[in-house]
């Protein structure tokens, strides 16, 4: 299986954050650094969905350990993107450094198939590796 890696830094200088999306074994890993914007989340979602379709994987690890908390409208933008997923099923583990980002992650992903982990990438990977609704 070929490895995929995408760096998304936005199309203009106003972008405050960066994201990397790559296929690592059976998982799609999305790393977000800095303060994300709605555009960055949209581009990251596009890359995640590309890999979901191309590699046939629906388990996604979001590493937000180096992310700064964005304004609350940014997580709502991600929720709107998720409402457009249609039949695509994702199982997501979100690794956060603090309670503020954990709260924003819960706002972002609502009632989806996800779990938030505090600073524990190993446990997040273990959870994703278990049999779940989305493979």
Task: Report each predicted region and the residues it spans.
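Amphipathic, Lys/Arg-enriched alpha-helical "gate/interface" segment within cytosolic domains
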Residues: 2-135
